[in-house]
């Protein structure tokens, strides 16, 4: 009799076990659903936007070889400049005798084009995920505003160097056709201004408590810079009677 009681008791224990006992999520990983359903995690994800910004003080930056520059190489930057360690004659990417001098294929180590579009894809993906995010509206607005701001910043830097560039607004998968045509300079400016308009509407005012994060004032500053660039002689023939870009 006791033997049968043990069997019945064991059966009850087994039947009481959770069916998903062996279907546990990895404890060392988070899914996208986890990230975009939590404001703190979504903010941490958006923090990576700041790592996309181009570092203007690295030894690879071509602007670092001018007499007025701050050059980061080894120890003292001023010492490197003062000692003429790098000049237009010694810097290989400006030396015409060194495989053709400076052009796009000679500065691939800067990764300006690749890093910009890598960041743009990252931001586009973030914007898609944030549309269905259940986090609080205030958090959602500010994070979305940051994404629009950084996309505008990246495109602003691109058009300064290349003029019109392809405008990528979607997230492409491995099997998608992703060849894009080059937009005109004016089309790029209009696209960037639209992103900055959204950024200004969504970003919060300046707050010392979050010093260093994008805010409404910074978006306005970039907008002013962009419109000055668009109206400059660099992108407008000074002899042209037509008005400059707005």
What annotation goes with each model-predicted range?
Residues 1-27:
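Bacterial Sec-dependent N-terminal signal peptides
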Residues 17-71:
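Membrane-proximal, proline-rich intrinsically disordered regions
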Residues 27-31, 170-176:
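Short linear capping/connector segments at secondary-structure termini
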Residues 43, 51-61, 82-162, 177-190, ...:
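Conserved, well-structured interaction surfaces
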Residues 148, 220-226:
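TPR/Sel1-like alpha-solenoid repeat signature
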Residues 159-160, 166, 229-238:
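Short coil/turn linking the two alpha-helices of tandem helical-hairpin repeats
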Residues 169-172, 234-246:
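Acidic, serine/threonine/proline-rich low-complexity intrinsically disordered regions
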């Amino acid at each position: 009799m006791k033997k049968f009681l043990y069997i019945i008791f064991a059966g009850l224990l087994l039947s009481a076990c959770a069916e998903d006992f062996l279907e546990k999520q990895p404890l060392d990983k988070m899914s996208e659903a986890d990230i975009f359903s939590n404001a703190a995690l979504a903010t941490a994800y958006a923090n990576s936007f700041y790592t996309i910004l181009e570092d203007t003080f690295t030894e690879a930056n071509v602007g670092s070889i001018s007499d007025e520059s701050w050059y980061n190489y080894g120890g003292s930057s001023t010492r490197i400049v003062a000692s003429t360690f790098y000049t237009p004659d010694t810097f290989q990417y400006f030396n015409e005798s060194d495989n053709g001098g400076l052009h796009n294929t000679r500065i691939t180590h800067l990764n300006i084009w690749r890093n910009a579009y890598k960041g743009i894809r990252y931001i586009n993906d973030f914007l898609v995920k944030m549309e269905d995010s259940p986090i609080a509206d205030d958090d959602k607005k500010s994070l979305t505003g940051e994404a629009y701001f950084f996309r505008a910043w990246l495109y602003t830097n691109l058009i300064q160097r290349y003029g019109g560039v392809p405008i990528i607004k979607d997230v492409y998968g491995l099997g998608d056709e992703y060849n894009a045509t080059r937009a005109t300079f004016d089309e790029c400016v209009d696209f960037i201004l639209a992103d900055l308009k959204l950024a200004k509407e969504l970003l919060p005012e300046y707050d010392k408590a979050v010093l260093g994060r994008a805010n409404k004032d910074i978006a306005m500053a970039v907008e002013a810079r962009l419109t000055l660039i668009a109206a400059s002689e660099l992108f407008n023939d000074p002899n042209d009677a037509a008005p400059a870009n707005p």
